[in-house]
């Protein structure tokens, strides 16, 4: 069984940092991983409805096959998908950027809990230096 399903962004700048973060948590080979541009935003947006379907199908398989206990949602700062989909650059105002990511991370958490109330959901925001903060 896997402990969790991780949703992260496709940004090439952070792939190694994501792996290092998960390894640092002692989760090497303990999680399934789905990658969508924009992470939480990608799973929710109407910009590409196929991404919504893909996320939910992956979550179902992770739950049914690997009996995951939690979903880890990891957005990151200076996300190009947020710029493209929302047509705004929030990276210049860190507080606003945190609020915007927080909104989509919360919205996805609520949607997950509606379908899978038994799953724990973590909401994280990665900085470009690879450090991670929890988002409330």
For each predicted feature, which ranges?
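A short beta-strand-loop structural module common to alpha/beta enzyme folds
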Residues: 29-39
């Amino acid at each position: 069984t896997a402990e969790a399903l991780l949703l992260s962004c496709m940004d090439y700048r952070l792939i190694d940092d994501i792996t290092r973060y998960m390894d640092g948590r002692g989760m090497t080979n303990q999680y399934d991983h789905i990658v969508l541009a924009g992470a939480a935003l990608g799973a929710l947006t109407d910009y590409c409805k196929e991404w919504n379907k893909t996320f939910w199908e992956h979550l179902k398989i992770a739950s049914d096959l690997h009996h995951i206990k939690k979903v880890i949602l990891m957005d990151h700062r200076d996300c190009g998908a947020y710029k493209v989909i929302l047509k705004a650059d929030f990276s210049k105002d860190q507080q606003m950027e945190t609020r915007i990511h927080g909104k989509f991370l919360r919205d996805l958490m609520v949607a997950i809990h509606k379908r899978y109330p038994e799953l724990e959901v973590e909401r994280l925001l990665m900085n470009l230096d690879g450090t991670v903060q929890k988002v409330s």
